Amino acid sequence: MKKRLFAASMAFGLAIVLASCGGDNQTTSGDVKTTTDLDKTTTETKTNSGSYTIEVYDLDGELVGNETLSIEEYPSLWEGLNAKFDVEATGSDGSHWLTSINQTVVDKSWSLMIYENDTLASTGVDGIVVDNGDKFTFKNECWNTVESGWGSMDSYEVLLDQAVYHYAKTKMKTSIASSTSCFDSTFWQSISLYNMMKNKYDSNLFNVNSYSDAYKESITNANLDDLRNATAWATDANIAKWYYAARLFDTDLTKFKEVYGTYLDSLTTYGSEYEMPFTLSIAKELELDNKIKDDVKNPTSRASLQYGTDALAWQITGMALYTTLDDSEFSPFTLDAINAAVNDFGADLSTSVANVLFPLVAMNKNPRDFALDESNTDLIKYLFDNCYDKENQEFLTEKLGAGDYSSNQIYASLMAYKVQRDTGTGVILFA
């Protein structure tokens, strides 16, 4: 999403001064820049002895930095900040536009705001003169809100940003590296991580190289010797999940191709029509389709949308893997058919709402445009009102309806939706 160019009053300019220099301030997100003419000079006289304190809070509201500094040693706020914190900044002619402090994110529509003694500062980091006993607090705050009168985001989208940030900061960090299976929730984490990587959110949230390497190792170490029994509920769809995640992260597929070829040699029938598109699609991509017996490719055994919403997420995956199959081998899914199935689902709250969100994002649709029930409650609002524990910042899977669905699935789709919203470009979740 491009940040709007506001023809606003100086009051608003002061409010979004963020952590920038004193003159010609600019926002750091988007292609369009907001500028204000703030005088870098000050006539205020302050002491050159004593100390001042700097506090830094991330988007979670968590204190991630707290230092007390000597004015004699660090006479300017910038000098103290740069010496004691992990600071990233841009700027020219000696000015400093802060983009990150201690890896705290400056996300799209969010800003690092400076509070001087608990009052919003009227200038940027280069225009502030320190005094003995001063406290400078840097906080992440969302400016692009309907409530502020300056933006378009409502309280639910602000909550979504906070939820996605918290998930990326905590859950992904601890579970990706420790996982030994890519047939379940880790797959959804791979989708989340991939979206963050491709859209450069990773640089502010975590070291993308360390976590992508850990995830790649997790994929590589998965047990491929008995694919259909790798998990208690392994199917061709779960095999497709491993293959898809491996393909996203450029994992060596030599071992997989060998094992998968042996599996296709032994395949005499599909467990169900539901599994068919995954097997055919992977076989085509790996040039192993000659191993699939003709009677297995019975054209009467075609996957359909008649399995209900439980299958929608897997069907989308199958469609994404689908490359060269033609109608004689496989009747491909159409977006119209998926859209119709989603609309038919509508008020059926007994099935996991997660499965509605996936196809909508995959279709490059805005989930908020689709009603969940007769009162036109939108999907994201429903999720946060009914399925989200705000205190602990996590989705309650037991409230997501029927089906054993991990909250990782929800976050994968929310991340894709967020990327789509912030960049103004379509994000295909399964592509």
Model-derived segments and their meaning:
Residues 17-20:
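C-terminal motif of bacterial Sec signal peptides marking the signal peptidase cleavage site
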Residues 128-132, 146-431:
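Preference for long, amphipathic alpha-helical scaffolds in soluble/luminal domains
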Residues 1-5:
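Positively charged n-region of N-terminal signal peptides that target proteins for export
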